[in-house]
Amino acid sequence: MTSHPVFIDLSLDEQVQELRKYFKKLGAEISSEKSNKGVEDDLHKIIGVCDVCFKDGEPSQIDGILNSIVSIMITIPLDRGENIVLAYCEKMTKAPNQPLGKVCLQSLWRLFNNLDTASPLRYHVYYHLVQVAKQCEQVLEVFTGVDQLKTQFANCPPSSEQMQKLYRLLHDVTKDTNMELSSKVMIELLGTYTADNACVAREDAMKCIVTALADPNTFLLDPLLALKPVRFLEGDLIHDLLSIFVSDKLPSYVQFYEDHKEFVNSQGLNHEQNMKKMRLLTFMQLAESNPEMTFDTLTKELQITEDEVEPFVIQVLKTKLVRARLDQANRKVHISSTMHRTFGAPQWEQLRDLLQAWKENLSSVRDGLTNVSSAQLDLARTQKLIH
């Protein structure tokens, strides 16, 4: 979302006077005269009635009024501005419809970008900004990822408690429209806990696991097991279910579902979607150790019919998690490569061996080219001596 700098030609006193007159004309309970207590008291009273303009005003006109209020707010010293900013943010969440919600969103974004980057007030503005963005379906305009979020607060990082609150909100506003982003937010949330307070993050840990399992684009689930709050769930059904998705095959999930059907459903997880994901994960695991698989093997391991094998493999190839070739004539699937479901010490050793082999091959090529080059130089010198 773009934001324009705030520039108002009138003096602060003139702006305050005009705003008071405007809101009084709309029927707000406010005096048209300036406060003798100063501009901060004026702002408190103006902000207290500013939502009156939501009733009948045009969005473009309201945007101008809110812009004027913001231009005054950003002049207030930090130590005296917190209550004013919080009151304004709260008013911006009261927009009665989506068009006005977008106006309020733009106003908060303008305020956020005109505050000093080292101001702790930016956190509070951004939190309300996300709330308003949800109301008018503009979340991705203000939040595109965790890295972008951290960059915005680089000069004044919020406390761990504040970030936990913000991550929970971001999870809530993205879970229905972007599960992959929502899952990343929850993983980041769990990363804010330490060994000392991980035990109190039970609810967050469960949400994180459920979000990751439900996300159709999240397949590498092994890192979740290393998160401290997730470790505290060991022995719980949700941890057992996660472990199945991390390293077990489809039959293990089927058995778990038969034994704990009510639990799975109570978590908001869709059994058919779980089956679809577990089939793909099972196929990946089989591909790690089998360069070729018969259709018979796949029908047995994936619990599908032979007619479903080809469509299934095509769907797997679309994910780009596995590179393979269908051999319909011989009823086989030839595997070229696959992403590992888990990436532990064995995988690091395999990667090390692969890189070492590449290094040795490159050294052999270099030595060969050096020998060829030397031979050509010797030949050239010999021919020169002959002539």
From Swiss-Prot:
Residues 181-340 form the PCI domain. Coiled coil: none annotated. Keywords: Cytoplasm, Golgi apparatus, Initiation factor, Protein biosynthesis. GO terms for cellular component: cytosol; eukaryotic 43S preinitiation complex; eukaryotic 48S preinitiation complex; eukaryotic translation initiation factor 3 complex, eIF3m; Golgi apparatus; investment cone. GO terms for biological process: formation of cytoplasmic translation initiation complex; Golgi organization; protein secretion; sperm individualization. Signal peptide: none annotated. InterPro entries: ARM-type_fold, COPS7/eIF3m, eIF3m, eIF3m_C_helix, PCI_dom, WH_DNA-bd_sf. It is found in: Cytoplasm; Golgi apparatus. One of its GO terms (molecular function) is caspase binding. SUPFAM superfamilies: ARM repeat, Winged helix' DNA-binding domain. The keyword Protein biosynthesis applies. It holds the Pfam family eIF3m_C_helix. Component of the eukaryotic translation initiation factor 3 (eIF-3) complex. The eIF-3 complex interacts with pix. Component of the eukaryotic translation initiation factor 3 (eIF-3) complex, which is involved in protein synthesis of a specialized repertoire of mRNAs and, together with other initiation factors, stimulates binding of mRNA and methionyl-tRNAi to the 40S ribosome. The eIF-3 complex specifically targets and initiates translation of a subset of mRNAs involved in cell proliferation. Belongs to the eIF-3 subunit M family. This is Eukaryotic translation initiation factor 3 subunit M. It comes from Drosophila persimilis.
